[in-house]
């Protein structure tokens, strides 16, 4: 309720009407409810990834796997940052695009250096596939004027890489969380717990 009240107040003071704040863009414009369909599903992929990781990190059972808990938290937070960026078009409209992409690259390199063994043990192929697809999306985004195709075709390829990358990321997050539960169940079984 507090978030709702604060959001209303901030947006009203910024000049938005109640209708603009409360109603879906498709309702306001009279457009189809499927306007931005794949983009919206992409945001849901990021949100689901973050929720899976953070829930898994929060349920306990990490006596001997603190590094894995840290990895779940970092991957979960990165997923939510990607969701917010994608939903609000932060790197497209409000923040320097190259700086945002550089931050993502640096964070990914730090993850690889610090957690390489864990990532490869859990689901290295999914992590590298998702990362590769997302890197291709960024590459196409940064170089779209250099391709000898019209904007619509280049955008389709770029968004396709991003969407499939986000879906692969969700799969990786699922594997990361399930690995944590499998490992926890295995250790309970070895200790004779039920």
Question: Predicted regions span which residues?
Answer:
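Polytopic alpha-helical membrane-helix bundles and their juxtamembrane interface segments
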Residues: 1-193
């Amino acid at each position: 309720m507090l978030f709702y009240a604060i959001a209303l107040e901030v947006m009203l003071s910024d000049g938005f009407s109640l209708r603009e704040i409360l109603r879906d863009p498709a309702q306001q414009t009279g457009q189809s409810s499927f306007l931005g369909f794949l983009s919206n599903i992409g945001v849901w992929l990021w949100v689901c990834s973050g929720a899976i990781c953070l829930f898994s990190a929060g349920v306990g059972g990490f006596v001997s796997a603190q590094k894995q808990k840290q990895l779940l938290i970092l991957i979960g937070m990165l997923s939510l940052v990607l969701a917010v960026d994608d939903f609000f078009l932060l790197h497209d409209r409000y923040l320097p695009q190259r700086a945002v992409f550089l931050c993502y690259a640096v964070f990914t390199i730090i993850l690889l250096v610090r957690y390489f063994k864990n990532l490869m043990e859990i689901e290295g192929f999914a992590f590298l596939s998702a990362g590769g697809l997302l890197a291709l999306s960024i590459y196409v985004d940064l170089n779209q004027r250099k391709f000898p195709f019209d904007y619509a075709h280049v955008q389709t390829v770029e968004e396709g890489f991003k969407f499939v990358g986000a879906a692969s990321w969700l799969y990786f997050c699922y594997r990361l969380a399930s690995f944590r539960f499998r490992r926890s169940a295995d250790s309970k079984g070895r200790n004779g717990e039920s």
